Amino acid sequence: MPFAELSGLVAALCWTVSSLMAPGLIQRFGTMRFNTFRIVIASSILLVICLITQRFDATLWQHAEIIMLSGLLGIFIGDTMLFTAVHRLGPRRTGVLFATNAPMSILLGWLFLGENLSFNQLFACGLVLVGVVIAILFGRKNSLLGRKNSLHAWEQTKGKLSIGILLALGAALGQASGALLSKPALVDGADPIAVSALRVGTGALALVLAYGLYYRHKQPAEAIPFSQLTRFDFMGIAALATIGMVIGMSVLVWGVGNANVGIVTTLSAVVPVLILPGLWITTGQRPALGAWIGAIFVVAGAALIILFSH
């Protein structure tokens, strides 16, 4: 398997780690403040890397507008929706829903980039979607019996389930469309880290404006006042930004530029599988059988897409 396509798996591992780190930090920061700090930190790191290594070139600026649009869709809108969904649904169910960005990417790549789909690839995408449905409907213990008291907080739903599902699916669409928009610049030879820096920087600017003008005065009641946040809180969010955005997103952007968009994003969709043992260790609760079955379908679909693409 080409290393460019394996980048999807590396991104998935990074996002799994950041998903497990996120719920506690979101609880303390509040979703919008959490995402603003996270993206600003990631943007600053990427900017420093690009300036030191002189990665900004003419090719990047030729595609600047479309890359910035990619950042608005994938980072500002997509990432905000993603971590809002994590807060509402927990990391496991959000990860499973977010896996739909793989078939979305394949469909968008077919529609707008001419990346052809075979019947076998469509079948494999269908397996991913079936896995998502199974994991959502049967993915937590006692889901059919209605007993919720024994559930870990990460498996409980905050607010309406339908809103959480729509947020996660919106995040998946934002990720898929953002990756699609960044590909022309990468194909023309723009540096992947520079593309990632411009995307994340655009998202950071939009988040700072949105937070400063509106959300700063609308923190959730359970969020910790800024003066009470500790250095460990900021160290945690810096680590999360580095793992999930600086490393994970940059690797994914590089893969998108060197391989089929759908294949890379489908491999990045194995987060629901990677997260299961992490949740078992973190929460002390073994995931339900439906979670494992759904995850198996997701992995099988991803593997078949790779198989059918060569």
Task: Please place each PLM-identified region on the residue numbering.
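Glycine-/small-residue-enriched transmembrane alpha-helix faces in small-molecule transporters
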Residues: M1-R33, S44, L151-A194, H310
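Loop-to-transmembrane-helix transition segments
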Residues: F3-A11, L47-C50, D57-M81, F98, ...
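Hydrophobic core positions of alpha-helical segments in small-molecule transporters
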Residues: V10, F37-R38, L97-T100, F119-F123, ...
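Transmembrane alpha-helices of multi-pass small-molecule transport proteins
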Residues: A11-M21, I26-I77, L127-I134, V195-A221, ...
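Hydrophobic/small/kink-forming positions within alpha-helical transmembrane segments
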Residues: T16, L47, G71-F76, P103-L107, ...
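Membrane-interface helix-cap regions at the ends of transmembrane helices
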Residues: A42-L60, L111, V133-W154, P184, ...
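Loop-to-transmembrane alpha-helix entry segments
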Residues: D57-Q62, F98, S105, L111-N149, ...
